[in-house]
Amino acid sequence: MKIQEQAPAKINLALNILGRRTDGYHELRMVMQSVSLCDTVTVEETGIGFALLADGFTVPAGKSSLEQQAAEAFFAAVGRPMPPLTVHLEKTTPAYAGLGGGSADVVALLRCLRRRYAPEMPVEQLRAIGLTVGSDMPFCVSGGTALAEGRGERLTALPALPDCWIVLCKPEFGIPTPALFTLADAGTPKNRPDIDGMIRALSAEDLNGVAARLCNVFEEFLPEEYHEVFHIKNRLLELGALNAAMSGSGPTVFGIFREKTAAKAAETALKQCYPQTYLAKPVGELV
């Protein structure tokens, strides 16, 4: 029996770093949004042990696989041995992009396992299992539009992002997240997101108000070799975006558009220089 789940990417409509905690993690306050750019995860009980196949290639099993770690944590939580599992991963979301693609894949696997082996499991327990593997994962369990606090594990559902189109553009390089956090720890951002104002705009279904408040404090700490991010932001604005921002620790930049025609034209224009450019829509809650 095969079970399949979509793994939507996420963007950060707002991202604020409040400080470094004594446990080594950072205290964050973010508005997160699922988008329709997604991978597909299929799980079947077959084979021997745990096998992960990504786009036809077998990923070596082992503790380094977040998918295997999550599966082991799931079956430990439900109190039964892990059966032989084969996980098929069809990738669309780019890796190391600030879009939470890896976390979304792991959580899609957990949702598959919950459907098959523990449909009565509370969503809160699934989030707790995800948190043992990564800080992004509690949000990925339910998705939609949410305020995320703490490491990202304290979630408050928010009114949905008004209907719009989102263009995502990833340059060829990646940005190491730990290095960016280190730079942020050493400085103080000049601008912080107006998250309360963004929540009011979401409640009022005010797309312009949401767009006006897009803000990611990581942008202020980008080393010069990554300043192509700002070129992409400016290009999105020239192409008609209401506003644009970097997602997560980057390097993907997204722009919000009211009309599909303008968004599609922007996608086409950016794709000439940046093959990893995508057109997406907001996605509501998953569970």
Model feature map: region roles:
Residues 100-102, 246-251:
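Glycine-rich beta-strand-to-loop/alpha-helix junction loops that act as flexible
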Residues 142, 147-243, 258-287:
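Conserved, helical-rich catalytic subdomain that frames metal- and/or nucleotide-binding sites
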Residues 48-60, 109, 131, 204-214:
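Short, basic/glycine-rich phosphate-binding loops at helix/coil junctions
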Residues 254-256:
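Short hydrophobic/aromatic beta-strand micro-patches
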Residues 97-123, 139-141:
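DPxDG-like acidic metal-binding loop motif
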Residues 122-133, 214, 264-267:
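Short, well-structured alpha-helical segments that form the helix of a local strand-helix-strand
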